[in-house]
Amino acid sequence: MRGTVYKSTGSWYAVLGQDGQMHECRIKGKFRVQGIKSTNPVAVGDLVQFELEQSGDNPHGVIFDIVERRNYMIRKSVNLSKQTQIIAANIDQALLLITLNNPPTLTPFIDRFLVTAEAYDIPVILVFNKIDCYSAEERFEVDYLLSLYRTIGYTCLLVSALTGTGVDDLKQMMEGKTSLVSGHSGVGKSTLINT
């Protein structure tokens, strides 16, 4: 059966099968994707082939093939090895959530993200979140960053999950697209997704 990986925990994967059901799956034996030294060969967004197996009372799937990826986005493994981590595959766009404080997102982080996305031909939307929390000085800094990144061709959006500012525009930009939502812990990814 064919399906799409929706969640990866490292050894188990939630796969939405073509039957419309979510299946818990694992990979079969030593699984390698040609040309990529990765900490985990299966990524969220991958189209996979899997077989259902019965093991006691818990049926599960076994992934035996990954359909060729349209694209993917990686990051270096945090343990300083030469391996990479595929963070998403087959995506239409990436959204980078940015906050000036709680937590701060620094421009080198933004720039590294943009370079990585450009390397894999993935369009990026910069989403400046928590705009309801900024002082006049911080708002000036946001305006500077907006001007900077818009000038070099990036779509930028101001949002606040708390007040709803910009949320409808964000939903419209995501409509019908497979989007990677990224950013530091605490920038509001889950809050915005659940809004």
Which residue stretches match the model-derived regions?
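Residue-level signal for inorganic ion chemistry
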Residues: 45, 117, 129
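Conserved beta-strand/loop subsegment of P-loop NTPase cores
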Residues: 90-98, 121-131, 150-159
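Short histidine/acidic/glycine/proline-rich micro-motifs that form metal-
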Residues: 100-103, 131-135
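Histidine-anchored nucleotide/phosphate-binding helix
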Residues: 108-123
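Canonical P-loop GTPase G-domain recognition
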Residues: 133-187
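Walker A/P-loop
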Residues: 185, 190-191, 195
